[in-house]
Amino acid sequence: MDIKIISDKNNPLLHRREVKFLATFDGATPSIKDVKVKLVAILNAKKEMLVIDTLDQEFGKLEAKGYAKIYEDEKIMNTVEKKSVLEKNKLEEAAEVAEE
C-alpha cells in the first residue's frame, strides 16, 4: 500500500493538523488500522493522537481517499471529535491488541 499526501494544513483554532491523502493498494481495501500505521510513519505522529475521519473508495478503483486529523492534545481531541469517529478508531486499536 502506498499513501500520497494531497494536502496538509495546520488548524491552530482546533489545535490539530488536517491531512487529506490518497491510498493506493492491491486487493481488498485496507483497514483503518493499516492506514493509520502507515500514516503515523509518514507524518511522524503519535498513534494515539491520529484520528482517521474518512476512508472512501470509489467502486472498482484500487485507491481510497482519506481524511485524517492529528491533534496536539488528547483532551482537545476528546472534546472536539465525534464519539463515533473516536470509537471507530479505538475499535481498530482494540482489534490490534487482541491479535497480539
Curated annotation (Swiss-Prot):
One of its GO terms (molecular function) is structural constituent of ribosome. One of its GO terms (cellular component) is ribosome. One of its GO terms (biological process) is translation. Belongs to the eukaryotic ribosomal protein eS24 family. The keyword ATP-binding does not apply. PROSITE patterns: RIBOSOMAL_S24E. It holds the Pfam family Ribosomal_S24e. HAMAP family: Ribosomal_eS24. This is Small ribosomal subunit protein eS24. Keywords: Ribonucleoprotein, Ribosomal protein. It comes from Methanococcus vannielii (strain ATCC 35089 / DSM 1224 / JCM 13029 / OCM 148 / SB). Disulfide bonds: none annotated. The gene is rps24e. InterPro entries: Nucleotide-bd_a/b_plait_sf, Ribosomal_eS24, Ribosomal_eS24_CS, Ribosomal_uL23/eL15/eS24_sf.
